[in-house]
């Protein structure tokens, strides 16, 4: 299953390593990936920061917010920087609820209380969730399945029998279905699917 997709991925991966990763030192590549990934992941959720805006924020912090951008958007990007650095620094650690919740806490610390008063960064939702036209199931039932998803994914990582890209995509799909947090599920799902790739020595996508 997915043999053709894996072949295409491996071809693109080889080209990426030849044209991009081998032409940068470790620190340059890390910052390049962090800026691109943070800009695009937050952009999917409606953040208007461009890649250049995100790079400027990374270099200058809150001392200079690009014209036309909000402080809330800046805190979203800064939170993503922190969560990205925290999670990818845990490469040797297994997938656990503790790691999941702490990453969410770091990501949403300065934005969730403003967007969803009463919601606690790092804690699961206490209400049923919806996103756009999608209505998710009963939240307690879905949240109860999170440990199983983490355990089965960690087991697959340890056994090494599933291609990392397939495993990352599978995790992302199931995690978004469970939608366990009040906000930030998309960003957390993308962070952890890339964490799976990172653990296998693959680049951030």
Name every feature range the model reports, one short phrase each:
Residues 1-205:
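FIC/Doc superfamily catalytic core
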């Amino acid at each position: 299953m997915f043999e053709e997709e894996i072949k295409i991925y491996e071809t693109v991966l080889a080209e990426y390593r030849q044209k991009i990763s081998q032409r940068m030192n470790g620190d340059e590549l890390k910052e390049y990936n962090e800026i691109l990934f943070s800009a695009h992941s937050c952009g999917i959720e409606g953040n208007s920061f461009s890649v250049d805006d995100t790079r400027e924020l990374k270099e200058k912090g809150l001392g200079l917010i690009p014209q036309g951008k909000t402080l809330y958007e800046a805190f979203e990007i800064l939170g993503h920087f922190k969560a990205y650095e925290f999670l990818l620094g845990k490469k040797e650690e297994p997938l656990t609820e503790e790691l999941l919740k702490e990453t969410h806490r770091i990501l949403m610390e300065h934005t969730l209380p403003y967007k969803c008063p009463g919601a606690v960064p790092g804690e699961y939702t206490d209400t049923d969730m919806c996103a756009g036209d999608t209505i998710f199931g009963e939240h307690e039932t879905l949240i109860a399945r999170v440990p199983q998803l983490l355990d089965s994914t960690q087991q697959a990582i340890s056994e090494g029998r599933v291609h990392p890209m397939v495993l990352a995509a599978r995790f992302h799909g199931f995690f978004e279905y469970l939608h366990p947090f009040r906000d930030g599920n998309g960003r957390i799902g993308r962070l952890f699917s890339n964490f799976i790739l990172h653990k296998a020595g693959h680049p951030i996508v």
